[in-house]
Amino acid sequence: MRVLTALLPLAAFLAGPAGAQASDRAGHYYLRGVMETGSELMLHPDGRFQWYLVYGALDLFAEGRWAERDGAVILTAERTKDVPEPGFRTLVLKVEDRSLVPPDGRGAYVRPADDRD
C-alpha cells in the first residue's frame, strides 16, 4: 500500500502534461490564407470537434472526434443527425507552432488570439 501511495504523485505528474496539451490545443480556429474560402474548426476539450468549409456554392460540414499525436491533429468524422454526410472521413492537420495546416499545405487554421499579422 505504501508503494502505491508513493507512486501516486509520479502518476499524476506523468498524466498531467498529456491532458494539458490536449486542452491547450482545444479552441476555435479560422482558416487563413485561402482566397474566397471560409472555414472554421472548433476543437472541444472533451475530444469532439465541429468543422465547416464554404467555397463558392460548395458547403461541407463534419463533426466527430479529434486527437493529437505525432505532430498532428487528427479529425475523425462521424455521421450524426445534424451531419449525415460528413465532408471527409479523416483529416490530418499538421501542427506548426500554434497553427493547424491542412494536408495540401495551403492556408492554416489559426486562433484569433494567435493571429498577429
Regions found by a protein language model. Give the residues of each.
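Lipid interaction determinants
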Residues: P9, G16-D117
